[in-house]
From Swiss-Prot:
<keyword id="KW-0963">Cytoplasm</keyword>
<comment type="subunit">
    <text>Homodimer.</text>
</comment>
<keyword id="KW-0808">Transferase</keyword>
<dbReference type="InterPro" id="IPR015421">
    <property type="entry name" value="PyrdxlP-dep_Trfase_major"/>
</dbReference>
<dbReference type="GO" id="GO:0019264">
    <property type="term" value="P:glycine biosynthetic process from serine"/>
</dbReference>
<dbReference type="GO" id="GO:0030170">
    <property type="term" value="F:pyridoxal phosphate binding"/>
</dbReference>
<dbReference type="InterPro" id="IPR015422">
    <property type="entry name" value="PyrdxlP-dep_Trfase_small"/>
</dbReference>
<dbReference type="GO" id="GO:0035999">
    <property type="term" value="P:tetrahydrofolate interconversion"/>
</dbReference>
<dbReference type="GO" id="GO:0005829">
    <property type="term" value="C:cytosol"/>
</dbReference>
<dbReference type="Pfam" id="PF00464">
    <property type="entry name" value="SHMT"/>
</dbReference>
<dbReference type="GO" id="GO:0004372">
    <property type="term" value="F:glycine hydroxymethyltransferase activity"/>
</dbReference>
<dbReference type="InterPro" id="IPR001085">
    <property type="entry name" value="Ser_HO-MeTrfase"/>
</dbReference>
<comment type="pathway">
    <text>One-carbon metabolism; tetrahydrofolate interconversion.</text>
</comment>
<dbReference type="InterPro" id="IPR039429">
    <property type="entry name" value="SHMT-like_dom"/>
</dbReference>
<feature type="binding site">
    <location>
        <position position="122"/>
    </location>
    <ligand>
        <name>(6S)-5,6,7,8-tetrahydrofolate</name>
    </ligand>
</feature>
<feature type="modified residue" description="N6-(pyridoxal phosphate)lysine">
    <location>
        <position position="230"/>
    </location>
</feature>
<keyword id="KW-0554">One-carbon metabolism</keyword>
Length: 417
């Protein structure tokens, strides 16, 4: 028998308890600019930390291989129904443990080993699972990669040319570091010209799509995958969506279970359901609109400060910064900003001469700071502070002065009260 008091984390494992406390302190004291990060609500965290973690539930709701699933079935059914409503589709699989797992399941459902896949190059802003040679997607399948044009937009002419030349079985439209708007219709026209399945990876923009402030990939795509954190502000996990295609939906269902996963994480699925309910509220639309405004506010200041933005600016929540002209690498800038209580991630830029471990760029985004309550005024300040540090990496005085300003700002906008 367990006692919530006697067997608390603090009493049971002080090392882990202390590590969590330090992370809570870091999250309060640092401005979070990593584009793929956000803050989950107390309700989401409560569901994820619930006793649902104890329940094994192989299979799908109503069709389990274990008894005692009648209540976790409620949670999964709610998650599915809310996801369908949120994205306007008739099929949602809420069981993928991550976005990468969701992608892997789609590949397994649609492709055979050795089939050709056309996806965005990692160096141009794509994701590892879009065909990178170091990832399963580039090892199991014949991966062909497209990039950006001279204006920093997706090179649709190249996509069409590569599709015509290589006849891919599937084309992936999606990104992890691209600040533009994807033309889903143009991708569909290219896919149809070679009889390819079109898949959208909307992991970064799912919240924007759900709120109607970024183009919805349906009805142009056959299937969309996403994570459930990032702009969706839920727990870390994955999601598969499709519409008006029961044959494909059946394949995705079996591709997840028993294809690549066993028991689903019912506590995470419950947390997904909570996040989807939150995303269906009118306030979520207001939040996503502010995400876009805040990204544009940072763009304006960074341009004024002489920092180059790949693609010329942003039309979503993220900005990819080329900091070559500062004389410092992405690795150096990330470390310096960390000392100044600003969290970013180093990121390769198109045709980057530096390795992915060093880079010439930084990727920043507005979802987390918007959740925190920042508006344009605060984001302009943050962008100026970022520029102060990036042009003066290693200057202890600049870093310390910036950290003090960041701490003052963070105290005014606590993440959790």
């Amino acid at each position: 028998m367990f006692s919530f008091e006697k067997n608390s984390l603090k009493n049971t494992d002080k090392e882990i308890f202390d590590a969590i406390e330090l992370e809570v302190k870091r999250q309060h004291e640092h401005v979070e600019l990593i584009a793929s990060e956000n803050y989950a609500s107390p309700a989401v965290m409560e569901a994820q930390g619930s006793q649902l973690t104890n329940k094994y539930a192989e299979g799908y709701h109503g069709k389990r291989y274990y008894g005692g699933c009648e209540f976790v079935d409620i949670a999964e059914k709610l998650a599915i129904e809310r996801a369908q409503q949120l994205f306007g589709v008739d099929y949602a699989n809420v069981q993928p443990h991550s976005g990468s797992q969701a992608n892997a399941a789609v590949y397994n459902a649609v492709l055979k080993p050795g089939d050709t896949v056309l996806g965005m190059d990692l160096g141009a802003g794509g994701h590892l699972t879009h065909g990178s040679k170091v990832n399963f997607s580039g090892k199991i399948y014949n991966s062909i990669q497209y990039g950006l044009d001279e204006n920093g937009d997706i090179d649709y002419e190249q996509v069409a040319q590569l599709a015509k030349e290589h006849k891919p079985k599937m084309i992936i439209a999606g990104f992890s570091a691209f600040s533009g708007i994807i033309n889903w219709q143009k991708f569909r026209e290219i896919a149809d010209s070679v009889d390819a399945v079109l898949m959208a990876d909307i992991a970064h923009v799912a919240g924007l799509v759900a709120a109607g402030v970024y183009p919805n990939p349906f009805p142009y795509v056959y299937v969309a995958t996403t994570t459930t954190h990032k702009t969706l502000r839920g727990p870390r996990g994955g999601l598969i969506l499709c519409n008006n295609n029961p044959e494909l939906a059946k394949k995705f269902q079996s591709a997840i279970f028993p294809g690549i996963q066993g028991g689903p994480l019912m506590h995470v699925i419950a947390a997904k359901a909570v996040a989807f309910k939150e995303a269906l509220e009118p306030s979520f639309v207001d939040y996503q609109k502010q995400v876009l405004k805040n990204a544009k506010a940072m763009e304006k200041v960074l341009k004024q400060r002489g920092i180059n933005i790949i693609s010329g600016g942003t039309s979503n929540h993220l900005l990819l910064l080329d900091i070559t002209n500062t004389g410092f690498s992405g690795k150096e800038a990330e470390a310096a900003l960390g000392r100044a209580n600003i969290t970013v991630n180093k990121n390769s830029i198109p045709n980057d001469p530096r390795s992915p471990f060093v880079t010439s760029g930084l990727r920043i985004g507005s979802p987390a700071i918007t959740t925190r309550g920042f508006k344009e005024k605060e984001c302009e300040l943050v962008a100026n502070l970022l520029a102060d540090v990036v042009f003066n990496c290693g200057d202890e005085k600049v870093e310390n002065e910036t950290a003090a300003k960041v701490l003052d700002l963070c105290d005014k906008f606590p993440v959790y009260k």
